[in-house]
Amino acid sequence: MSPGRDCTAFLQWALPSLQRSWPGYRRVRHLLCKRLAQRLKALGLADLEAYRRQLATRPDEWRVLDALCAIPVSRFYRDRGVYGALERRVLPALVETAAHPALAAWSAGCASGEEPYSLALVWALRLQPRFPDARLRIVATDSDPEVLARARAGRYARSSLKELPEDLRVQGFEEKEDGAWRIRDRFRAVDFVQQDLREAMPDGPFDLILCRNVVLTYYAAPLRDLLVTRIAARLRPGGALVVGAHESVPPGVRELVAWRGARMIYRKRAAGHSGD
């Protein structure tokens, strides 16, 4: 069997034990195989069969393997249509229907901070002038302390900003001497917290939650469904949940319905309301 097939067979065997979904990892399997090769080298193991034996005799290694399966891929303004819908439909509706002037948003699985900072830019530069009395508090969580450190630093390669509209890039960033682009201080009011979604979540309630390309892609049922239910419980009635481009909410989570005219966005039904 070739090394690639060996790795695929190993992932198909190991991922279910971590309550992770092999189909979700199919497109990024080469990244995981590269990480596994590095881990084998660090342990001085000859092949994946030896690593299987290591997992059998050293249960703590499963935690290491689980960490290797984290996919911190993100970029600014990922899925332009989502941010357009948030700007034109969702956030204005949340402001206009809120019983309070301060909205709360949560970016779940925020990686290096591109998503929460994109939201902060859209809010401050596009929506705050329309709603001067409203405020938006943003909490962002991830399980990886290294990516959170990069998020707090707020420094990015020019390539990660390529999808960001020009006005947001010009007003939101300053180019440094080393070629990095640093988000300006006025847009850095994001509360970054290290949390593993499987173990803890912010209390909420939130008006807006972004959970894209994490739970619904990489976790297997029933853990996936349980996490989505817990996430939905942290949404205010009428609040919005944003998912990834190829994701959909499990049908058993009945309190979430598609937000009309806003692809990839769900709305939480009001308590006791059964219609759309």
Report residues per predicted region.
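Conserved SAM-binding loop of SAM-dependent methyltransferases across substrates and taxa
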Residues: S112-R130
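Conserved AdoMet
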Residues: S2-W106
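Conserved class I S-adenosyl-L-methionine
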Residues: H100-Y117, R137-V139
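Core SAM-dependent methyltransferase catalytic element
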Residues: P250-D276
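Extended basic-aromatic, gly/pro-enriched interface segments that bind polyanionic ligands
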Residues: A108, P129, A134-L210, V214-L223, ...
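Conserved beta-strand signature within the Rossmann-like core of class I S-adenosyl-L-methionine
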Residues: P237-A245
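A structural alpha-helix within SAM-dependent methyltransferase catalytic domains
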Residues: E87, A120-A124, A232
